Regions:
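Glycine/proline-centered hinge or cleavage motifs at structural transition points of membrane proteins
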Residues: 188-190, 202
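Short coil/turn motifs that cap or connect alpha-helices
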Residues: 95, 190-191
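Helix-loop-helix "hairpin" substructures at the membrane interface of multi-pass membrane proteins
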Residues: 194-195
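Interhelical loop and adjacent transmembrane-helix boundary motif
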Residues: 223-254
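Short amphipathic alpha-helical coupling elements at transmembrane boundaries
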Residues: 50-54, 101, 134-138, 179-187, ...
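A short amphipathic helical element positioned immediately N-terminal to and/or at the very start
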Residues: 8, 12, 50-56
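Membrane-water interface segments at the C-terminal ends of transmembrane alpha-helices
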Residues: 17-47, 58-174, 203-223, 251-253
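Short, Lys/Arg-rich, polar N-terminal cytosolic tail immediately upstream
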Residues: 1-16
Length: 254
């Protein structure tokens, strides 16, 4: 009995030592990751109040509205472009399905600002699309003759670039959940349309929202595309305050 308890105490001591090492390592890693945030919060309370009131009166409302409007637009189109193709690829078999599945991932390989520049140039007045319609179908040329450097078009382009985040998570979730629950609902006489919205979508919410979260983070940190479109967001405001105006305090507040 004495040997048993001695061995038990020794084992507990070893596990306790290992747990302490893991805890200390986790705390050290967390401090390293959170250190920039702590520094920003520390600097936030040391900036001049005049810059804060200038920011509030002249810039903050515009930055806030544009940022949230762009988030809403991109989220809506990303969910649309991500969930529906994932559903079709998962539940239907057709020719070229595997090739289409690979193609739907490719927008992640293209930077958002390059996609925004390319599409806006193609659709511009001197671009190939409007030039083609002016030369061949004059009556339809006015349909495309518009200013595309607008926040609505930017939200659509960013969704075309970022929807694979939602497509990937939705595709995996539909593959794992789809067959079992869809077969059960089919046996109960429920249509595929109702099963999709009432069963599969609610069960796949965690996966969908995880992809949507990544989309939102990408929209918030995007600079090149919003700068090219001339849309004032928090990111462009930070760059303008820090590098153009040399006002680090206002950049930190943003």
């Amino acid at each position: 009995n004495s040997n048993f308890w001695q061995n038990r105490l020794e084992i507990n001591r070893i596990f306790l030592l290992q747990n302490k090492r893991w805890i200390l390592g986790s705390v050290f890693l967390a401090i390293i990751l959170l250190l920039p945030i702590f520094i920003l919060f520390g600097e936030l309370f040391s900036v001049q109040e005049s810059s804060f009131f200038y920011l509030w009166d002249n810039l903050l409302i515009d930055y806030t509205f544009n940022t949230f409007y762009l988030l809403i637009l991109t989220s809506f189109f990303s969910l649309l472009f991500g969930i529906l193709p994932a559903w079709l690829i998962t539940n239907y078999k057709f020719k070229g399905r595997n090739i289409l599945d690979v193609i739907l991932y490719l927008p992640l390989a293209i930077p958002t600002y390059i996609m925004a520049f390319t599409y806006s140039d193609m659709l511009s007045y001197t671009g190939p699309i409007q030039s083609f319609f002016r030369n061949n179908f004059v009556e339809f040329s006015t349909i495309f003759n518009r200013d595309y450097l607008q926040i609505e078009f930017l939200g659509l382009l960013m969704a075309l670039s970022l929807y694979p985040y939602i497509y990937t998570s939705s595709r995996v979730s539909f593959s794992l959940l789809g067959s079992n629950y869809m077969d059960l609902s089919k046996n109960l006489g429920v249509s595929k349309f109702k099963s999709f919205f009432k069963i599969l979508i609610p069960l796949s919410r965690p996966a969908i929202f995880s992809g949507l979260f990544l989309v939102l983070m990408e929209v918030l940190n995007e600079y090149g595309a919003v700068k090219y479109f001339g849309v004032n967001t928090y990111t462009t405001g930070i760059f303008r305050s820090w590098f153009s105006m040399g006002d680090i305090g206002t950049a930190i507040q943003l």
